[in-house]
């Protein structure tokens, strides 16, 4: 569990927010049940590095001027033109109470079906789970090694873990192997052009 330092914000002018961002920090807000919203700022690079290394559902200890809070990132706002972080939302979590979270699905292995020319499809990229904050995995692995052509891997096929509960429909498809795609080759035209009918000569019956 990472610990990041944050500073309390009391000035909400636009010019102040711009100064915060120009200094390499990102403004944010901490909120939660039975707690007042708290405006903060923290180093944007440290925050992004933590999320990249430990996953989006990691628990972060925010040290706000000496007072610590256990939080999760619930939203990140970015400027698409400048490609920079402009705001972050943090939710205070109770480490002893279960919460819902979306966790990425990571396919592992090379399926037999793909080796035989089949096409891998993955319609499900995240699983909804319920777990205590510290038990939320960075990702959930789905082994596709034994999948052959026309096989499917469903949520029910994933390994059962006691540390979290999966909320998705057990029959929901995680991955499947489609048959090889065959390109249709047009058959040559073997039909001969019809011959013109022969002209039929009529014999004149002129009394000769």
Swiss-Prot record:
Keywords: Ribonucleoprotein, Ribosomal protein, RNA-binding, rRNA-binding. Residues 186-195 have a biased composition (Acidic residues). Residues 196-208 have a biased composition (Basic and acidic residues). GO terms for biological process: translation. It comes from the Bacteria. Pfam families: Ribosomal_L25p (PF01386), Ribosomal_TL5_C (PF14693). InterPro entries: Rbsml_bL25/Gln-tRNA_synth_N, Ribosomal_bL25/Gln-tRNA_synth, Ribosomal_bL25_b-dom, Ribosomal_bL25_C, Ribosomal_bL25_long, Ribosomal_L25_dom, Ribosomal_uL5_bac-type. One of its GO terms (molecular function) is 5S rRNA binding. Residues 178-208 are annotated as: Disordered. Part of the 50S ribosomal subunit; part of the 5S rRNA/L5/L18/L25 subcomplex. Contacts the 5S rRNA. Binds to the 5S rRNA independently of L5 and L18. Belongs to the bacterial ribosomal protein bL25 family. CTC subfamily. This is one of the proteins that binds to the 5S RNA in the ribosome where it forms part of the central protuberance. This is Large ribosomal subunit protein bL25.
